[in-house]
Design a protein with these regions (language model features):
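A generic structural signal for short, solvent-exposed coil/turn residues
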Residues: 17-20, 79
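Sequence context surrounding c-type heme c attachment/ligation sites in exported
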Residues: 26-67, 75-158
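Bacterial N-terminal signal peptides that target proteins for export
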Residues: 2-17
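Conserved catalytic core of two-component sensor histidine kinases
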Residues: 71
Length: 158
């Protein structure tokens, strides 16, 4: 019989992770303008959502934790974390971004920097992880980073 986890922080971690994955996938499923910058950043974030989904599945079912797969997904995020930010330079390439990306560029840059930091920390932690418990805090930080940026800089969709 499957073990039911009632740990409140674990439930929050799973919720944040799933929300980040859904937001990432939603960003890519909406109509993209014919702007290559919009397409590039949405493609990148869809890939991030896919990686978060793989790791999130392990978070939901810790007995399925596969250290090699988790390590691979975490390394991908860390290596790819700097990729989309240059595609936000043109304020005409709006896509699902809010005007705050450009009007509050310093805070947006801080969010991007934080994402790069927490994905690097997750990747480093994953290198020696033997269970989901080992990576849970770092994984939660990545999910929180996604959520924070999407809350402030992603247009709400209906």
């Amino acid at each position: 019989m499957a073990q039911v986890y009632t740990n409140k922080s674990f439930k929050s971690l799973v919720s944040i992770t799933l929300m980040a994955a859904v937001l990432g996938l939603t960003a890519c499923s909406t109509s993209t303008e014919s702007n290559p910058d919009v397409q590039a950043r949405q493609d990148t974030m869809k890939n991030w959502g896919d990686a978060m989904g793989v790791m999130g599945d392990m978070a939901k079912a810790p007995d399925t934790f596969d250290s090699e797969v988790f390590k691979e997904q975490a390394a991908f995020l860390a290596e790819d974390a700097a990729k989309p930010w240059s595609h936000f330079e043109d304020p005409e390439a709006v896509g699902n971004a809010t005007e705050a990306v450009w009007s509050n560029a310093d805070e947006f840059r801080a969010e991007a920097d934080n994402f790069q930091k927490v994905t690097a920390e997750l990747s480093a932690t994953a290198q020696t992880a033997t269970s989901m418990d080992d990576v849970k805090p770092a994984f939660g930080q990545v999910g929180a980073s996604c959520k924070s940026c999407h809350t402030d800089f992603r247009a709400k969709t209906e």
